[in-house]
């Protein structure tokens, strides 16, 4: 499992298909990432992605889900 400490602000998040999902704003606790609201796909809202969706981290955060699935299932900030 990926450690939350491996994820840093401003890292690009990509789906399993290599398509851009968003940009990390910061880790929210130890189990979810908060994405920036200024990203082109964010619609002006922060979105949360569970750490459980992360496959691995290198210079990007790679998800186990495709970008389309991640965006369909991410949680908007209240």
Predicted regions mapped to residue ranges:
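Peripheral interaction segments used for macromolecular assembly
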Residues: 1-78
